[in-house]
Amino acid sequence: MEIIIGLLIIAVGAFCQSSSYVPINKIKQWSWESYWLIQGVFAWLVFPIAGAMLAVPEGHSLWELYAAYPKESVLTALFGILWGVGGLTFGLSMRYLGVALGQSLALGTCAGLGTILTPLFLGRPGDLTASVVIGVVVTLVGIAIIGLAGHMKSQSLSEEQKRAAVKDFNFTKGISVALLAGFMSACFNIGLGFGEPLNFGDATADIYKTLPATFMVTLGGFLTNATYCLYQNFRNKSFGDYSNSSLWANNLLFCALAGVLWYSQFFGLSLGKGFLTDSESLMTFSWCILMALNVVFSNVWGIILKEWRGCSSRTVAVLISGIVVLIISSFLPEILK
């Protein structure tokens, strides 16, 4: 029963993450670099540090925790900086491919590499049991099926239909950016692996134990994204976006909403893993579960946002079959163990 609860919590977080780009459409008259930076303040600083505080028992502090593990804290943040590159290109992948296909390809690469590389970096190859590896393979198969549906979509739609669904649609450029985003985004889970000691042991509840490490990763990612966004503000002379006070109430609200929805995936991952401690295979596979469910829900949003409008019934059938495979992959390691 606890395993089911854990998986459901992760699923809720995945749904929230996949919904996080919807509020961005409500942001008015701001350039990409301006709204990306402001939503990042919420997604990578405000809410992660609030979450990390839940792991701190009374009489202690986060600074005390990080000071006690300086090497682990630095490594976690460094992988966060690398993940930040993935975060930047992740946004571009959706710009060129749309929410459904862009998230699918980037998260697929991220799911596979994040799950496989983390135990190897930590010197624990034994964590990669046969059931975990099979689960990763099935996940990648599901994402490949969705990628095939995306390719079928690109072949069947006219240029006008492509632009109507995704304004800057560019399949070739989008594929390249999405694969890079996935590779660099896998560093998030590697960072979480190095940050495993960042908690107060038995004084921290299992459901909160990864949250201090999550904050260090997002802090590193914020540094990368903030540097790039401020550079783009300077280059594009878009600093004026921040001075238009008439837009602040609306844009701040939707940036904050996007930020809390985005962070929910890692808050949910931490809570969910707290219920999976009896299953070593699912603990190792939890990253892949989160990414797979992100893909599932991102494609649900893609359908809702009519990104698949005009596609043949065959293309939609391929898409749905890929979603079904991903759902099955989420609990496959537990069945096979």
Where do the protein language model's features map onto the residues?
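Polytopic alpha-helical membrane proteins, predominantly small-molecule transporters/carriers
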Residues: M1-K337
